[in-house]
Amino acid sequence: MDLGINHNADFTKWVVSAGLLTEPFVLIDVGVQGGENIRWRPLGDHLVVHGFDPIEEIVQQLTEENRGRSNRHYYCMAVGNADGEQAFYFNPVNPSESSMYERRADQSDKNASEQVRTVPIRRLDSLLAEGLVPKADFVKIDVEGFEKDVLLGAPKLLRAGAVGMETETNFGVSPAYPKSHFGTLAELALENHFLVFDIAFNRVPRESFQRALVHKGLKPISKLDSLGSPATVNVLFGRDLIDEVDHQSNYQNPCRPFSVSQLIKSIIVCELYSLNDVALDTAERFADRLGAHLDVDRAVRLLADPDCVTNEYRRQIRAFELSTSWRITAPLRWAKMLVFGAPAEASKSVDS
């Protein structure tokens, strides 16, 4: 369900190793449980992380694991649209399901056991004004439904120089999200000129369907990508710098100017999320501005990578299929199929 991860990232590795990225890349990670995503690794020591999580145990672990790294900062607090304290519902069985919202009474999960904790909560704009966090280049938000409050408390930070944002969302509606969770976040993102760049989601079949399969003597569906409506959604938002320059009238508020550093960082974000076509298009469109700082022709060559979206597991499977042992045993597998037929699961139809 994760968004694209570019394991090549040749452009990013080049600008970092050649010293062409002249300032840090600041990532604000709200809901940093598990640490920052591996996609940011090509930035090396240029990556500065400011991570937030209201679970004290998580922050202590991350702080200990990154001891001695001056570019990693973790804070035990919630982030929202208020400065003060607020109730936090901690799930010790599954900490990733902890939330600023209390679990609904109709959710009958025998493994769910919430602990109410009072935690500090801060607005990102307040932290920025106090100098506790710097201007952000990218913001990632995963806070179990509290995303709207995070965005409402961060308009100045987002407009101060951020080129992109990733958030978890869904298409459901609720009293807190009458326009749908996704619709609300997309509207708030657009106010900062963030457009949808990519989307990834899983699918969860309804429980009645799963019960019917079991009643029919079939196994319930375990894969979360084969059947069902979209459930959990990850969305990448970004500033389309080409569109902002060429079609300023498309936006309801003035387009903000951007520096060459922001331009390079925007290209980096696109590449790290496997959107090399957008990255390359941006490099070509602003070649005149970039040309004084880097070799644009080389940048284009590095970004013209058709394997930027190759999933790592698919890469491994493909390598296995091309291996000598797999090719040598191919006739045996074919003979087995002729004798015994295809596996039952592969041949069974939906109507059987």
Which residues are covered by each model-predicted region?
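Phosphate/nucleotide-binding beta-alpha loop and adjacent structural elements of enzyme active sites
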Residues: 1-319, 330-351
